[in-house]
Amino acid sequence: MSEVKLGLGLSTGMFYHAPKGTALPTDPTAAIPSTWKEVGDVSDAGITLATSKTVTNLRNWANAIKRVIMTEHSETIQAPIMDTTEESLKTVVGEANVSKANGVVTVNLSDGELPPEEAFLWVMKDGDDMMMIGCTQGQVSAVDNVSFAPGAAINWTPTITAMGDDGFKLIMKEATGATGATGAS
């Protein structure tokens, strides 16, 4: 088994969302509970986890740092969704901004409100090793510019900010007896 992991999306489902507060699955090899709805495929750019910490240096009278305290911490994931579906659009702009009637989906792209908080989950596979990263409380806080061009997939790239005390969690299960990573199945 290799300590170097590849962040390859699972071919049978990569990105899921569920109501805010839904518990994250505890075993990456088990079936995803039905409370989680599949959002769609993530592009080959993969997901990007970013953490940010703001600190304050406490100094004594001689201007020597005596203590460093964290004043702010944030975690975000950017996930370029390459599926343009009713479910992916509900995730990006909020369910209230997506309607469907007679097979026609209409999306309000101009709403100035953020979508409601949800739970989010991404599933990855590297050979027989499985990983998930997710949060029980997160919110789409931004969406990158969307290009509509011939010969290229339309990617909806939300930035999801983890909220509350839990933040994002990485859950990993390594295959027993594996000798190395072989790529996605």
Where are these regions (language model features)?
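Oligomerization/assembly interface segments of phage tail-like spikes and tubes
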Residues: 67-89, 151-166
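Mixed-charge, glycine-accented linear interaction segment located at domain edges/termini
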Residues: 129-185
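Extended, acidic-biased charged interface segments
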Residues: 115-132, 136
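Polar/acidic, low-complexity leader/linker segments enriched in S/T/G and N/D
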Residues: 1-41, 176-184
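Beta-strand-rich interaction surfaces with strong enrichment in secreted/lumenal proteins
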Residues: 64-67, 122, 146-148
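Extended, positively charged loop/linker patches that create polyanion-binding surfaces
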Residues: 89-121
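Short, solvent-exposed beta-alpha or beta-beta edge segments that form flexible loop/patches at the rim
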Residues: 50-78
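A generic structural signal for short beta-strands and their flanking turns/coil linkers
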Residues: 45, 71-77, 103, 116-118
